[in-house]
Amino acid sequence: MVTVVKTSPFEGQKPGTSGLRKRVVVFQQPHYTESFIQAIFTAMPAPGPQGATVVVGGDGRFYVKDVVQKIIRIGAANGIARFIIGKDGILSTPAASAVIRARKADGGIILTASHNPGGPENDFGIKYNTRNGGPAPESVTDAMYKATLAMSEYRTIDSIADIDLSALGEQTPFDGFAVEIVDPVEDYVRLTKSIFDFDLIKRFRSENPHFTLLFDALNGVTGPYGQRIFVEELGFPQSSLDQCTPLEDFGGSHPDPNLTYAHRLVERVAKERISLGAASDGDGDRNMVLSHDWFVTPSDSVALIAHHAADCIPYFRSNGGLRGLARSMPTSCAIDRVAQRKGLECFEVPTGWKFFGNLMDAGRLSICGEESFGTGSDHIREKDGIWAIVAWLNIIAHVSQTIPNTSVRSLMLDFFSIYGRNYFTRYDYEEVDAAGAGKMMDRLRGHSTDIVGKSFGGGAFTVAKLDDFEYTDPIDGSLSIKQGIRIVFDDSSRIIFRLSGTGSQGATVRIYIEKYDSIHCDQDTQEALKPLVDAALEISRLEEFTGRKEPTVVT
C-alpha cells in the first residue's frame, strides 16, 4: 500500500519566519512539494506522526487543493490517523490555530503565502503549526530544514483516491485513517463570540444607524468569516462587505492590507465617509483599520486595544485583566507606554509571531502586535485580523455608552492626550538585489562603534547606539541573533533596518522610522518624520547599494 519514492534534496527548502514560500512553479517541480511535506512529518515533534491528528487548510490561493491531496496521501503513509480539513481546503490562519486548539490536534499544516500575490505565476507557501496552535519554533523549523538536506525518499499512498473537499463529514479511505471535512468558519465564530460582547455591538449598531462599517477581504480567505460575523451575527448590512469572495489569484491584486495595496478600500472610506473601514490579508492574520478622517497605524492600534481591553472586552475582564503586553522589535514603543502606566510586563521580541507563543503559554502575555499589520491575543497562537476589527467595534460600542459620537479619530486623540504620540512609518523596497541588500546590511553592522556620537539631519539627530538586535527567550532560553539593525538617537528616536524573510524571491529591505512627541500629536506623519527618513537614507546609502530611489510601499 505504501509507496517509497526516491528523490534527492532540493536547494533552498529552509522555512522562513512563516514557513516555506516560493513561486508556484517552484512547488510544481516533480517531487519538490512532496519532499517538503515529508520533511514536515519527519521533523514533527514527539511523539511524531504515528496516530496523530493534523489540521489542514489554506487561504484559497492557486494550488491549495492540489497540495491538500498530496498531504493526505503522504500523511497517511507516515502514520497520521486523522486529518481535519477545512471545506474546499479553506481555513484562515487564525481559524486553523483555533481549530488545532479546540480539537486538541497534534499540529496543523497551513497552505498560504499570506499577503503575497496568488495565481499560477505568483506565490505559494506551506507552514507548520504545533499543538499549541502557533507557528513552529526555530527548533522545529531547523529540524525540518535538516530533513530536507538529507532527503532521499518520501512515503505516499497513491491508491487513496482524491478526497471530496466540498463534502462536510468524515471519509475513511481505509481502516485506521480518517479525513474529516469541517465548516472552516464554525469553530472560529464560536470562539470570537466568547471573547467579545456581541450583544453590545449589535445594540450600538441599532442605536447608531449613522455608524457605517466597510470590510474588505481583498478576495482572500476572510470573506466567509466577514459574512458570518459582521452581517449574520452583528447585523451590519450586506453593503458593509467588499471583495469577500475568496479567489485563487485574489482578483489579480496584492492581498496586503496597507494604504498602497488596499487603495480601493481607502478611496471608498474617504468618499463614503465610512465610520470604520477595515481590511484583512490573504490568509486572514493581518488587518488594517481606518476611518474617513483617520488612519490607524498598526503600532497605535495594538496600543489602543491594550489600553481599553480590560474595561471593554469580556474575555479579559473574565480572566482578571491583562497579564502582559508585547511587540515585535520594529513596532513603535506606544504599547510600552501603556504597559508602564498599567504596571504590566512588556516584551520586545524579534519579528515573527512564533516568538509570542512561549510567553502566552507561560501565562505572561495577553495582547501583542507587529507593525506589519499583525494584532492578536492569547485566545489563539496566531495574529488575527478579524479579532482586531471586532475589538475596535467592541471598544467603540463600549466607550459610546458614556461618550456619544465616539469615533476612530476621537479614540486616537484621547489616547495621545494620555500617552503622547509615537510617530511611525515603514519604507519597503521589494524584490531588490539580495547581494546588494546584504552588502548594505554588512556595512551598517560594521558601523556599530564609529557611528556613535555622529549627527545627522543637519545636526538634529545624534546617534546614541547602533546594534544588531538579538533576543534570548525568557521561557526556554533560546537565542535569536541578527534580527535587525537598530540605530537609536539621543532623543530616543529610532531607525531600524531589516531584510524580510517573507518574500518568495529577491530581498525586501524594510526601514522603520519612529519619533516620540508628547506635545505635538496632530502632525502629518510623513512630515513629522521626513528629517529622520532623510537621515536613514544618508546613513544606509540605500540607493547606492540597491539602485532604488523610491520605496515600493510606504506605511
What are these regions (language model features)?
Residues 1-77, 172-213:
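An N-terminal, well-structured beta->alpha segment
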Residues 2-10, 120-270:
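Gly/Ser/Thr-enriched, mixed-charge loops and adjacent short helices
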Residues 42, 50-122, 228-290:
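N-terminal small/polar loop signature for handling phosphorylated ligands or for N-terminal nucleophile
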